Amino acid sequence: MENKQIFFTGVHKAELLENEVGQVKENEVLTKMEYTVISGGTERACLLGMNNTSKKYPMSLGYCGIGYVEAVGSKVNKVSVGDRVLVYHGCHSKYNIRPENDITKVENNDVSSLEAAFVIIASMGLGGVRKLEIELGESAMVMGQGLLGIFATQFLRLSGAYPVIAVDLNAQRRELALKLGADYALDPSDKNFVQTVKNITNGKGVNGCVEVTGISQA
């Protein structure tokens, strides 16, 4: 079976290449992908050949997406052919073969595939929020309102944090954060940034902060 898959074949170079789908082993699941999600941090770093990557080309990337089960191995019992499933560590390709443990059936038919495709990457934002152990009514800040940050902002709102302060240099991201649950959205380059945070929190500062800017200096 022919497959099409995105590979990074060099710095600044991505190609859609053809390869063959392998044989499904006894504990594996073959899925035909509907959506895969681009991780801005990982994919960008690899495409630019940054120092925190292997720089070994060609490389295939991708770790979250959704599709439908095409075939299962003889020992697979959690999913069946035709099931809509989340695929962890699946690549940006038409077909993926992954171990059963990397496959999760989507039980809720009211959730669209496009929405469900983000569950895996959203869970990373949730992980940051859970580590804070924020209590009801405690203040929290999210530094960076990219994909992970905007999810963390929403999870803090759902966790009962107040106020939720979103921080980003980009005005459009700050506006989106306010629409999705932030009580305040601040520009960290504002000379009054620190004082504004103190004013919002009655001089105490925030109880917890999730830092997802992707910038080491932050």
Where is each model-derived feature located?
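Glycine-rich cofactor phosphate-binding loops and adjacent beta1-alpha1 units
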Residues: L180-A218
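Glycine-rich beta-strand-centered segment in the early N-terminal region that forms part
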Residues: G22-I38, G49-C91
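Residue-level recognition of beta-strand termini and adjacent short loop/turns
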Residues: G10-H12, K25
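Mid-domain Rossmann-like dinucleotide-binding core that forms the NAD(H)/NADP(H) cofactor-binding site
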Residues: E115-D190, Q195
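A structural motif shared across PLP-dependent enzymes of the aminotransferase-like
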Residues: H89-E100
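Glycine/charged-rich beta-loop-alpha catalytic/anionic-binding loops adjacent to active sites
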Residues: D102-L114, I200, K204
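Extreme N-terminal starter segment of soluble prokaryotic enzymes
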Residues: M1-K4
